[in-house]
Amino acid sequence: VSKNISITSEELNSTDMISIVSSFPSNFINHRSPGIPNELRRKILHQQYKNRIVSDGLETGHLQLTDNGYIFKSKQSFSSFAGFVFEAYLVDEFNSKRTARLRAFQWATERSEGWSTKTFDEYKAVGTGLLSTKTNYLGYYEPQSNADIIFLRKSPLLDIMEPALIYNQQVSAKIQVKSIKNRFKEDIVDKVISGKYLRVITMLSDNFGRPSWVICHNILHHMLRTNAITSDVYANTIGRIQGPEYFDLNQYYIDDYYDYIYQWYNGNESSTKHTDEAAEQEITGYKYVNNVLVPIDA
């Protein structure tokens, strides 16, 4: 007969207990459980995202190589920094996962189901604020523009790169990436309605765990019901705001990654620890493969 074994909060938070539990693979532990100690949660997030932040940090230019190894430098606000990191994350995901890139390309170029994908594989996702773009496609490097992600291919007629266009229009297909937890109407909905942003991927859930794209859609529903917008504006806007799951990306993974970025940005993750792990895991050995930053041994 099994017996319940009680454990106090103090015992659960003890160094020994954290060490014991931390020896298990991090994906075996639900770090979202309210009973998980903060220190253990930080360790789990660190284990899951340490390589990801190095890759994205190098790409955005916020992680720099010095005589003392890799260190984090940024004069930007946290929200701006997180935005650049998620821009790098999405570009990486789109270029490494054809299904996600195809969905994003179809959405951004406003193509209907059943369109020919014959030329699609010629295009790659490009982040307008990323270092690889500055190095390889300087003319498309615009870190302050209203487009975080575009799609480029080599022109079949000229030896130049050209952007994907919205179907039957001479307008570049553009995606804005938002990594915010509030002010969704002012910073997303209103700007899509006004035309400042063509399309937005809003990455995060709010502080209550509600996906921000759902909140944006609810805002549009309310605006329609109260006659703040017409049915035409509603129909034209709602499909232009999507979240990660629209592209088969995991919302929980992204929210957890955001938490890890936050604790690292605010100094809860030691730069020395990252430097040591970079040496141990040969994170210094990154290279560009099809303009995606990957480990050399990948």
Over which residues does each language-model region extend?
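Catalytic centers of nucleases
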Residues: H62-T66, F72-D190
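Catalytic cores of nucleic-acid endonucleases
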Residues: F84, Y141-E142, Y167-F247
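Non-catalytic C-terminal interaction segments of nucleic acid-processing enzymes
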Residues: V1-S19, N27, S231-A298
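Generic structural signal of hydrophobic/aromatic residues within well-ordered alpha-helices
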Residues: L40-R41, I188, I261
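Nuclease-adjacent, charged terminal/linker segments that flank catalytic cores
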Residues: V1-T66, A298
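Generic surface-pattern signal
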Residues: V54, T99, I193-S194
